[in-house]
Amino acid sequence: MNRIKEISFSDAVAIVEPGVFTADLKSAVRAQKLFYPPDPASMKDCTIGGNVATNAGGPRCLKYGVTRNYVIGLEVVLANGEVLRTGGRVHKNKTGFDLIGLFVGSEGMLGVVTEISAAFASASTGARDVVGCVCDSGESCRSGASNFCGGVLALFTRNR
């Protein structure tokens, strides 16, 4: 149960078994300018199945979200032996109950995950640096905050 069954670069989806190491999946899609954002600290040692069981995140979760945000389909064996397939290859599936959200993070209490359909994000083209010169650090902070948080900042400073 540690195979990458399929990677479709055209629709940015992979079908994997739960024993696939997170680092292996990341490196398999890196060449196609895609990436799997959840990055637990134990990425080289943890598996996608473990990530699904615990809804793993990592430092990038603040920007990209956690495992739940990238699982679009599951095959789960329930306690009575019944096999449940939920979700699919569609990135945005909002019909019926969110069974994927129910299973991701349940730590195996609801069933055993045997197959995972994972979505990828587009890899960024790189970081950009910004250099500026300011005379008043307070003014530069206010200017930066208004550029990034414009309307929200106005709500907090309206009555000043």
Where are the regions a protein language model picked out?
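FAD-binding subdomain of flavoenzyme oxidoreductases
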Residues: 3-157
